[in-house]
Amino acid sequence: MELLRGAALLLLLCAAACAQDSCTCTKNKRVTNCRLIDNVCHCNSIGSSVPVNCEILTSKCLLMKAEMANTKSGRREKPKDALQDTDGLYDPECENNGLFKAKQCNGTTCWCVNTAGVRRTDKHDTDLKCNQLVRTTWIIIEMRHAERKTPLNAESLTRYLKDTITSRYMLDGRYISGVVYENPTITIDLKQNSSDKTPGDVDITDVAYYFEKDVKDDSIFLNNKLNMNIDNEELKFDNMMVYYVDEVPPEFSMKSLTAGVIAVIVIVVLAIVAGIIGLVLSRRRKGKYVKAEMKEMNEMHRGLNA
C-alpha cells in the first residue's frame, strides 16, 4: 500500500514539474515540445525538430518546413475561405541555425537559393554546385488595398506600418527605407546589408514572411491576428506581391524565361520586322511613283521640243 502511495506521489510531482516547465510560444504556432529554459520559452519546430527561441521570430526556412509538414499530415490550420496556393512553397533543407541551405533539391532536380529561400538559378541535376548562400539585401512589398471611396491618409498609413513592423516584428526602424502610397498601391522597402546587420537584429526575410502571412490571414503568431486599422478604419487588401533583390545578381539563362516573357519578346520582334517590311514596301512604292513622274516629264519635254 505504501508503495502505491509513493508511486502516486511521484507521478503527481512529475506532473506538477512538467506543468511548471511548460510554456506557450506566442510568436510561432507551428511548434511542439515547448519548455522553459532560464525563464525563456523554447520549442521544437514542427518538421525539423530544430529548437527555436519563442522570444524572437522563427526563421523563414523552419517556418516553411513546418508548413509543409503540417500540409502533409493534414494538421495545417486553414483560414476561413482559404484557397489552395502552392506558388513558391516547397519543403526546404535548413541549416541547424535555421538558415536555408544554399542548394535545394526536389528529388533529382536542384537549384540555388538566396537567404529568403527564393530560387536564383535555373534548375539542374544533383551535380549543381551552390558555393554560398547569397544574401537578400532589399525586399519590396507591394500591396493593393480594396476599393475605397476616398484615398488613405498617407501620413497615418506610413506611421502605422512603421510602428507595426518595428513593434510586432521587432525590426529596427533603420531597415525600413521607405513607405510609398499611390492609391491604391502601398509599397514598403526593407533594406539590410550584411555589413549593417548586427547580432540580434531580425532578418528582413523573416519579417517579410511573417508580414505576408499576416496580411493573407494565415498568421504565424499564436492567437494574435493582425488587425490593420488606419484612422479607426479596418484596411482590407486585394493583392500582395513580394520582390527580392540580392547582393549578387541571379544566374538565370534564356531557357528559364517564362512563356509570357517569351511571348512578349516574339511580339516585339514581329512588330519590328513588320515595321521594316512596311518601310521597304513604302519606299518601293515611292520609287515607282518617282520613276513614273520622271517618265511623264521626259515625254512632255520631247513633245515640246518637237
Curated annotation (Swiss-Prot):
Pfam family of the protein (one): EpCAM_N
Cytoplasmic compartment residues: 282-306
Glycosylation sites: N106, N193
Subcellular location per the Swiss-Prot or TrEMBL entry: Lateral cell membrane
UniProt keyword annotations, A-Z: Cell membrane, Disulfide bond, Glycoprotein, Membrane, Repeat, Signal, Transmembrane, Transmembrane helix
Signal peptide location: 1-19
Disulphide bond pairs: C61-C94, C105-C110, C112-C130
InterPro entries membership: EPCAM-Trop-2_C (IPR049420), EPCAM/Trop-2 (IPR043406), EpCAM_N (IPR041630), Thyroglobulin_1 (IPR000716), Thyroglobulin_1_sf (IPR036857)
A single GO molecular function term of this UniProt record: cadherin binding involved in cell-cell adhesion
Annotated ranges, domain Thyroglobulin type-1: 58-130
Topology feature Extracellular, residues: 20-260
Bilayer-spanning residue ranges: 261-281
GO terms under cellular component: bicellular tight junction; lateral plasma membrane
Protein's membrane topology: Single-pass type I membrane protein
Family recorded in the similarity comment: Belongs to the EPCAM family.
Protein name stated in the entry: Epithelial cell adhesion molecule
Source organism of this protein record: Gallus gallus
Top-level taxonomy: Eukaryota, Metazoa, Chordata, Craniata, Vertebrata
